[in-house]
Structure formats: structure tokens, C-alpha cells
Amino acid sequence: MSRSSEDKQIEIYEFIKEQIIEKGYPPSVREICKGVGLSSTSSVHGHLSKLEKKGLIRRDSTKPRTIEILKEPIVPKEMVNIPILGKVTAGTPILAVENIEDTFPISLNFIPSNKDLFMLKISGESMIDAGILDGDLAIIEKTNTAKNGEIVVALIDNEVTLKRFFKEDKHIRLQPENKNMDPIILEDDSVSIVGKLAGIFRRY
């Protein structure tokens, strides 16, 4: 093995450790590419395979972001597993999946402390002008109240939707953040707030 190849493996190994310590979870292959200055994901896969053969890391090929450091203990910053409850349509509401699909580990540094949180998958484009895109994971703080202008998860006839909330004279207005879409106007007693937006996670 050339010295440059071995040096690159050391650099990748150290980058993975730093990311786990900083974020609490390992980087993706593309993030490793960017972090160590490689343009080819296949090169990164090759280096990871060699690190795995050396017993320095362990991977699960069936799951993303499952690189585990084996040779030395890494203590990530305090973490919490947020349940992913299903899919919320940012457009036409669809029936929400109430059971937990998965959990997502995230450092407490990146979320509000002492809050009851869950995540929902975004599908649709009604919130694109607020920077919320199809495929995003929305981090939601559980609450049944909201102030005007806050982005909320609203329950309508056992369906959920993500919109900006406005309580007006005789109704509730759920406003999309897409100039091509109309607001949803509802009677006060026909909509319930189940949470408000605390953050967005996006995979690139």
C-alpha cells in the first residue's frame, strides 16, 4: 500500500471520529468525500473497506450512516432518539401513520431542551417558500397551542398537514408557503394543533 493511500485512510478514520463526536452520528459517504477532499464516492468506499478489513471500523451495508469505530471508545455528545411517526403531506393532507416507523439520533445541542419531540416526513411542495422541501424530516415539538404565524402540524379529520397557523375572527387559516396554493379555511372546532415546527433535517 502506498503511503498516500494509507495517509488518506487515516484522514478518513479521523474525520469519521470527529463527526461522531461533534454530531453524534457518522457521516455519509458524500460527506466524507467533501471532508477529506475526494471527488469519487467509489474511492471512499474503497478506503472504508480497507479500514473495515483492518478492524478499525464496522459497517452495516443495509443501512445508511452506520459506520462504527471499533479501536477506541468515542463518547458522543448527549444524544436523544427522536421517533419518526410517519409521513405528513405538505399539500393535500393524507392519513397519518400513527405508529413509529423509525427513530433518528440527534445531539441535544441541535434541538430545544426539555421538549417532547417527534419527526415527520414531508411530502409535497406547499411549504417550499419557507425552505421546507419534499423529503425533508420535520422535527416537531408536541403542543396543542400555537401563535399566529407559527408553522404547525394540524390534525383535520384524522389527517395531518404542515402549514402556517393563523387564528382569525371566525375561523382558522392554515396558510401554505407556496404562492400557487390556496389557504385552508376551517372552523375553530374542526382543527386541532398537535405540534409546531422546531427544526428541519435534510439529507443531501
From Swiss-Prot:
Active site: S126 (for autocatalytic cleavage activity), K163 (for autocatalytic cleavage activity)
Alphabetically ordered keywords of this record: Autocatalytic cleavage, DNA damage, DNA repair, DNA replication, DNA-binding, Hydrolase, Repressor, SOS response, Transcription, Transcription regulation
EC number, UniProt record: 3.4.21.88
GO molecular function, one term: serine-type endopeptidase activity
Broadest EC class assigned to this enzyme: hydrolase
Hydrolase recorded as keyword: yes
Domain of life: Bacteria
Annotated site, Cleavage, chain positions: A90, G91
Positions of the DNA-binding region: 29-49
The reaction(s) this protein catalyses: Hydrolysis of Ala-|-Gly bond in repressor LexA
Entry keyword Transport: no
GO process terms (BP): DNA repair; DNA replication; negative regulation of DNA-templated transcription; proteolysis; SOS response
Pfam families: LexA_DNA_bind (PF01726), Peptidase_S24 (PF00717)
Subunit structure: Homodimer.
Family: Belongs to the peptidase S24 family.
Function of the molecule: Represses a number of genes involved in the response to DNA damage (SOS response), including recA and lexA. In the presence of single-stranded DNA, RecA interacts with LexA causing an autocatalytic cleavage which disrupts the DNA-binding part of LexA, leading to derepression of the SOS regulon and eventually DNA repair.
Protein name according to UniProt: LexA repressor
Native organism: Clostridium novyi (strain NT)
Upper taxonomic lineage: Bacteria, Bacillati, Bacillota, Clostridia, Eubacteriales
